[in-house]
Swiss-Prot record:
Described purpose of this protein according to its UniProt entry: Has an important function as a repair enzyme for proteins that have been inactivated by oxidation. Catalyzes the reversible oxidation-reduction of methionine sulfoxide in proteins to methionine.
GO molecular function, one term: peptide-methionine (S)-S-oxide reductase activity
Lineage: Archaea, Methanobacteriati, Thermoplasmatota, Thermoplasmata, Thermoplasmatales
Keyword set, alphabetical order: Oxidoreductase
EC number: 1.8.4.11
Reactions performed catalytically: L-methionyl-[protein] + [thioredoxin]-disulfide + H2O = L-methionyl-(S)-S-oxide-[protein] + [thioredoxin]-dithiol; [thioredoxin]-disulfide + L-methionine + H2O = L-methionine (S)-S-oxide + [thioredoxin]-dithiol
Stored InterPro entries: Met_Sox_Rdtase_MsrA_dom, Met_Sox_Rdtase_MsrA_sf
HAMAP family per the UniProt record, alphabetical: MsrA
Any one GO BP annotation for this protein: protein modification process
Name under which the protein is recorded: Peptide methionine sulfoxide reductase MsrA
Record-linked Pfam families: PMSR
Active site, per annotation: 11
Assigned protein family: Belongs to the MsrA Met sulfoxide reductase family.
């Protein structure tokens, strides 16, 4: 059995690296979602004229990992209070969004955000919960970016700490290497 979800959490290199080794995740594909341009390029998305956000499509086995577990990991590596920004990555293409494919995902995402807000841990959460409209896979050179370029500056400074945080906090959900 396989299910799918679409998450925008800033740079898709980060999101792919974070979810890639999680038990129950079958595939993580970086791409673009939520905009109006058909088959956009990276350059077009970065221009902020397409309406798309850098997004990952996550294919997962719901018998091994729940959508709530995926949301917990997602919220652990993003700043849900900044609009159109994650760290130094600024622009609408770096916005945070959950693109739900059904009412169950919508309900779970909305409830998760309500519970986070009620916890007092964050000020106002700006992660949008939007119906899935489209997803376009990113160019091949974006796939497995962190794995292929671990010594690149952005990978060392931005991606690696997020991956390490998830491996420490969710060690019991990491695939055996």
């Amino acid at each position: 059995m396989e299910d799918v979800c679409y998450l925008a959490g800033g740079c898709f290199w980060c999101m792919e690296a974070v979810f890639k080794d999680i038990y129950g995740i079958n595939d993580v594909q970086p791409g673009y979602a939520g905009g109006t341009t058909v088959n956009p390029t990276y350059e077009e998305v970065c221009s902020q004229r397409t309406g798309h956000a850098e997004t990952v499509r996550i294919r997962y086995d719901p018998e091994k990992i729940s959508f709530d577990d995926i949301l917990e990991i997602y919220f652990s590596v993003i700043d849900p209070t900044t609009l159109n920004r994650q760290g130094e990555d600024v622009g609408t293409n770096y916005r945070t969004a959950i693109f739900y494919i059904n009412e169950y995902q919508k309900e779970r995402a909305v409830n998760y955000i309500k519970n986070l807000e009620a916890s007092g841990k964050y000020s106002k959460i700006v992660v949008s919960v939007e119906p899935y409209k489209n997803f376009y896979p990113a160019e091949d050179y974006h796939k497995n970016y962190f794995e292929r370029h671990p010594e690149q500056g952005y990978c060392r400074v931005v991606i690696k700490p997020k991956v390490e945080k998830v491996r420490q906090k969710f060690f019991y959900k990491i695939n055996n290497q």
